[in-house]
UniProtKB/Swiss-Prot annotation:
PROSITE patterns recorded: UDPGT (PS00375)
UniProt protein name: Putative UDP-rhamnose:rhamnosyltransferase 1
Species of origin: Fragaria ananassa
GO cellular component terms attached to this protein's record: membrane
Lineage: Eukaryota, Viridiplantae, Streptophyta, Embryophyta, Tracheophyta
Family: Belongs to the UDP-glycosyltransferase family.
Residue stretches spanning the membrane: 12-32
Bilayer topology term: Single-pass membrane protein
CDD domains named in the record: GT1_Gtf-like
SUPFAM superfamilies according to UniProt: UDP-Glycosyltransferase/glycogen phosphorylase
Amino acid sequence: MSSSSATKRKKLHIALFPWLAFGHIIPFLEVAKHIARKGHKVSFISTPRNIQRLPKIPETLTPLINLVQIPLPHVENLPENAEATMDVPHDVIPYLKIAHDGLEQGISEFLQAQSPDWIIHDFAPHWLPPIATKLGISNAHFSIFNASSMCFFGSTSPNRVSRYAPRKKLEQFTSPPEWIPFPSKIYHRPFEAKRLMDGTLTPNASGVTDRFRLESTIQGCQVYFIRSCREIEGEWLDLLEDLHEKPIVLPTGLLPPSLPRSDEDGGKDSNWSKIAVWLDKQEKGKVVYAAFGSELNLSQEVFNELALGLELSGLPFFWVLRKPSHGSGDGDSVKLPDGFEDRVKGRGLVWTTWAPQLKILSHESVGGFLTHCGWSSIIESLQYGCPLIMLPFMYDQGLIARFWDNKIGAEVPRDEETGWFTRNELANSLKLIVVDEEGKQYRDGANEYSKLFRDKELHDRYMDECVEYLETHAHHEV
């Protein structure tokens, strides 16, 4: 690029609209901050409660990031004040999608009035690309998922889809699909495939499938951004470009988050002070950190095995057990086994409010992460070389676990049909990863990968390339 063309390039106005889940909202916010650091104006669109719950934006960027609140329409069966997936049980999420689709008019009016150069959107607003096209606004799809998982879900291109029969049988999801041309162990266990088919491939209360949403938003975009990097998923990124017949699939890098300063944590630093006191008393590299995201609702039976497995391991543990804000469903009614807290007193800490995950993972006493395998959690853990004890439950979590299994951690053994695991299997997995000699390979692997995951310069270069694409391909550029 010549210096004269760079000089002529105008500052852009870029809007971002993530799906109503904080596992999506936070990576979108990281992208927004990087765009703002390049001097471009950003409009970050969500609903009022979600905007209020965002982490504090650095003061240097607040003049460039406008937080746009569009009220979520009232929908029957959706609790009042429920504006994100963490606010509702899993079976109510389709009603959140109905409300999300009700944002179409507000989004359309915003785009018409503000005429941004780009809108970067998620998988959910299937109606958005045609609106942007009609208004002459460029649009980009940003996938917060990793490339290997997205390849497993297949092509969204009409030309490619016609070459393969649609997957309708369970066994088609429990082996690597035919369009993956290289050896792969990424596939679903039967219990995961059942949940996937129920939740993704059949129309829900919103009237459309998640598959339709994904196809519409990818096929309607000019560029496909994805939270990945070539150092980890090079062949998968090439395959993704081929599958979707998109000339441009750009990795954003991993967007590794930085440890927040005390003035950026929304007044929650007192939580960390208490946690740090406890962690400081523990032996280096021996604490199990256990957390399963904000959406998981566990049955009492599964909950018991988790608790008793942690106890049986004999290891010190810090377990984040967040009560769901919706006040209903399995996750709200589960109770710790009788006498559990007394038996683990001093060795195990059960934490029931917000916890600063990144700070915990960065603490030297933490030696293993018992995780549901959300992509953001994997990235945060491997930044600090923390090996994984993997216990996936839904969505793409099983695919991510297969990708990393035997590299930087191991999955807890389970019944493949039901997903059941026992306290003994969990305890053995915890000890393997954190203290056993046989687990040293996983600890070493996680430590080696940490160099790549925390390489801020590398990941910033990926985002720089994405921003450069936005700068040179906006419809409104003069």
